[in-house]
Amino acid sequence: MTHWFHRNPLKATAPVSFNFYGVASTQAASKICSDLRSTRARLLELFSDITCNHEMMKNATDAYFSLLLGFIDSLDGGTQDNKLRYIQNFKWTDTLQGNAPSAQQDAVFELVSMGFNVALWYTKYASRLAGKEDITEEEAKEVHRSLKIAAGVFKHLKENHIPKLITPVEKGRDLETRVIDAYTVQCQAEAQEVTIARAIELKHNPGLIAALAYETANYYQKVDHTLATLDPVYIAKWRSYTQLKMCFYMAYSYCYHGQTLLSADKCGEAIRSLQEAEKFYGKAEALCKEYGETKGPGTTAKPSGHLFFRKMGTLVRNTLEKCQRENGFIYFQKVPPEAPQLELKANYGLVEPVPFEFPAMTSQWSPETHTGFDLTKRPKDDSAKPKKEEEVKPMKEPDIKPQKDSGCQIS
C-alpha cells in the first residue's frame, strides 16, 4: 500500500554533549555522561536508518531511556525531584510548526520529546513496510502491531509524563493534548484499515466489514474534528487526509451494508445504501485531488492511484448495478428517499493501543553514582553566560519509493 498513509516529519533536536565538567566528579558519573551521549546519538541515527526494525529500536530506546531516567526518577522511590532533572537544556522542533525549536532545561521534556519521536518512528516503519511490493501475512501483522505500539506510546506520554512538565505546553505544538490525541486516534484508525483489508481478503461477513469501516470512518472524523481547532496554516494538509479517509471508509460501510440489506431481501434499501456509497466515494476522489494540491508538512499519500482505492469504486458500481437488476426482475421495491442510518457496532477487530512503559532505570545508577554528580561545582555564572545557539537541523528521513502496486497487499 505504497503512499497510502500520510506522515508528518520527525521532530529534530539540537546535539546534547552531557559534558558536566567538574560536576561529574567520579569515574562512574563520567561514564554515565559518556553513555548518555552515545546512546542518544545512536537512537537519533536509527530514526532515519531504513534497515532499523522493532528489535533494534527497542534495544536503542531501552539503552537511552534507562540512563535518562536516572536524571528524573528518585533512586529511593520517593516523590522528591531528582537533583539532576534540571541540569541540562534540551531543544526540540515540532512536527507541524517547522524548525523553530522549543527549549526546556528539564529532563522530562527530553523524555517526552524523544518518546514522541519513537512513536512517530513506529508509524513510519508501518508505512514503509506496507509499501513493499509483496508484503507477507507476517509483515501485515507487523504493520498492525507497529501502529498499535505507536498509539500506546502517545497515550502513555499524554497520561503519565507530559503532565509532569514544569513549563506549560505551548498551544498547537506536539505535546499539547489536541495534537497528541490526533496522532493516537489516527494510529488506531490506520491499524483498523489493516483489519478491514484482512476481513475483505478472507471474505468475512459483510455486516462485520461494514461495521469496522464505519468505526474507522468515525475515528478519522474524530481526528478531523480535533485538528479543526488548531491553526489551519499547519494542519490543512493533514485534515484533507483525514477527510478523504473518512469519506472512503463511509463508502465502504454503505457498500457492505447494502450487501447485508440485499441478503435480507431489502433490495430497495440496498440500492439507497449503494447510492450513498457512490456519493461518498465521489467525495473521496475529489478530496484526493484537494489533498495532493494542499501545501503543508509531511509526506504526500497517493491513495487515488492505489488499486485498493480503485477497487472500491468498481465494487460500489458493480454492487449497485446488481441491486438495480435484482430489483427490476424480482423485488420491485421502492428506493427510500433517505439513506439508511448506520448504527453499526463492530464486536470484533477494534483496535486498542498496546500498553507502553519506559524501561527500568539501568543498574549503572546507584546512590554512589548519583552522589558523584556534585552540583556545587557548577559555574556560578553558568546561566548568565551568553551561549552560542545550537542549530537544530531537520531530521533526515529515508525516501519511500513507490513500488509496483499489486492491490490490497496488507491483508
Curated annotation (Swiss-Prot):
GO biological processes: mitotic nuclear membrane reassembly
Domain of life: Eukaryota
Pro-peptide positions on chain: 409-411
Biased composition, class Basic and acidic residues, residue ranges: 375-404
Cysteine methyl ester carried by residues: 408
Region (Disordered): 362-411
Subcellular location, principal: nucleus
Post-translational modification: Farnesylation is required for nuclear envelope localization.
Function per UniProt: Nuclear envelope-associated factor that is involved in the nuclear envelope ruptures during interphase (NERDI) repair.
PANTHER family to which the protein is assigned, alphabetical: BRO1 DOMAIN-CONTAINING PROTEIN BROX (PTHR23032:SF13)
Protein name: BRO1 domain-containing protein BROX
Species of the source: Xenopus tropicalis
Origin organism lineage: Eukaryota, Metazoa, Chordata, Craniata, Vertebrata
